[in-house]
Amino acid sequence: YNANEEKIIVDEPTVAVTRGESREVIAVGTEALDMLGKTADSLSVLNPVKDGGITNFDVAVGLLKKFLDKNLNNVFSKIRAAVSVPSGIGDVEKRAIEEVVISAGAKEVYLIESPLAGAIGAGVDINEPKGYVIVDVGAGTTEVAVVSLGGVVVSKSVRSAGDALDNDIIQLIKKKYNVEIAKSTAEKAKIKLGAAMVGLTT
């Protein structure tokens, strides 16, 4: 998201395709996801960021660089970056995330808890003396939190989220129709059919 232009610059999955032992990143995001299950033995499909933490530092840096070089025309080194992280994440994990973003070329990096970032993105005034329940469904983690007076009052996370839903869709289609679909296809179906409905009542 570019705050100056008020628009989303990159909206893609944190997936990378790497080559050989060097782990050279050759494809990222949707392009990499589409290659899942179709790569040669010399190529690997990796998730360098999982459950809100860094699982492969070098690949995470390579992925971020490719995203930013493609979309920001090499100006990333001149900007300050804000990165959302799960509530309750440890100091070691925080430092790893900061180091990845700095290594990718950012001038400065600030971490913000995911529930706060989600609330701000939804237009909620987080500084009000009111409690707002925020549900953040990521790829590997679903986080539920109460936000009030500019902070997270309480939060709880479970390691089941978007990826699990994708896998459930894949298994359902295979069981019902005996057809195997790609993870990217399952994700598209999830996004199209699983959007929240404003004004829905029970």
Map each language-model feature to its residues:
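Nucleotide/phosphate-binding catalytic cleft detector across ATP-hydrolyzing
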Residues: 1-137, 145-202
